[in-house]
Design a protein with these regions (language model features):
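Bacterial N-terminal signal peptides
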Residues: 11-18
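Conserved beta-strand positions that form and line the central face of beta-propeller blades
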Residues: 81, 89, 112, 122, ...
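Zn2+-dependent peptidoglycan hydrolase active-site motif and core
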Residues: 92-130, 154-156
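Conserved, short, structured surface segments that act as functional micro-motifs
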Residues: 135-201
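Surface-exposed, glycine-biased beta-strand/turn segments
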Residues: 24-108, 139, 169, 181-207
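Sec/Tat signal peptide C-region and signal peptidase I cleavage site
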Residues: 19-23
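Bacterial N-terminal signal peptides that target proteins for export
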Residues: 2-10
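A generic structural motif
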Residues: 83, 114-116, 160
Length: 207
């Protein structure tokens, strides 16, 4: 084995071990967090009544549209229906940890990811969930197989802050599947959270 090939082998081994260590860093969630879809995020506003998330310079490896080849449409202002083909893989939008992975009477097989940036994302109507509660996932990692029937296969996708739905088109363009380049501010007001863009072309946001 040449010196160059040895170096490549060592680098590959280190990357594999790093990925394995990331996957094994299980996150603990309470029984309530594992069962309740809509639940507040402990400590989210511990440093004040607002926080910001910067989407203006997100690397390609840090974001993935849940179904990259799907067609997305907004449903009632709070979720996206992403229609695709049978057998397609549902992907994690950002890095995070699996808070819920179970069958729900209302949403079928559902997965909720609590992300490091403070958001939570919902992936519902899955044929099969492929991740477990507490598991760390990376952006673009396969979470589930899309569900449906012979007429339509789709994922019901949503975004939450502190247990409440927000309009996902504030953050992502359903047509281009791209993140909107902006900084958003999440402000807690009584029992709700207001979402506002602090730096963006507001005309691009789908109402």
């Amino acid at each position: 084995m040449t010196i160059r090939s040895k170096k490549a082998y060592v680098i590959g081994l280190l990357l594999s071990l790093s990925s394995l260590a990331f996957a094994q860093q299980a996150v603990l969630f309470t029984p309530a967090e594992q069962q309740q879809i809509f639940i507040t995020t402990a400590g989210l506003f511990s440093n004040g009544n607002n926080f910001t998330i910067d989407f203006s310079d997100v690397d390609d490896s840090e974001y993935c549209f849940p179904l990259p080849v799907g067609n997305a449409s907004l449903l009632q202002g709070y979720s996206l229906e992403i229609v695709t083909s049978k057998g397609d893989a549902v992907k994690a939008m950002f890095d995070g940890a699996v808070r819920m992975s179970r069958k729900s009477p209302q949403y079928g097989n559902i997965i909720i990811i609590r992300h490091d940036n403070g958001l939570e994302t919902i992936y519902a109507n899955n044929a099969q969930n492929l991740v477990k509660v507490g598991q760390r996932v990376k952006a673009g990692q396969t979470l589930a197989i899309v569900g449906g029937n012979k007429n339509k296969y789709s994922c019901l996708f949503g975004i939450m802050v502190n247990g409440g739905w927000i309009n996902p088109t504030i953050i992502v363009d359903p047509n281009s599947h791209q993140l909107r380049s902006q900084v958003i501010r999440c402000t807690k007001k009584s029992n709700r959270v207001d979402i506002g863009a602090t730096k963006t072309d507001l005309q691009r946001i789908v109402s």
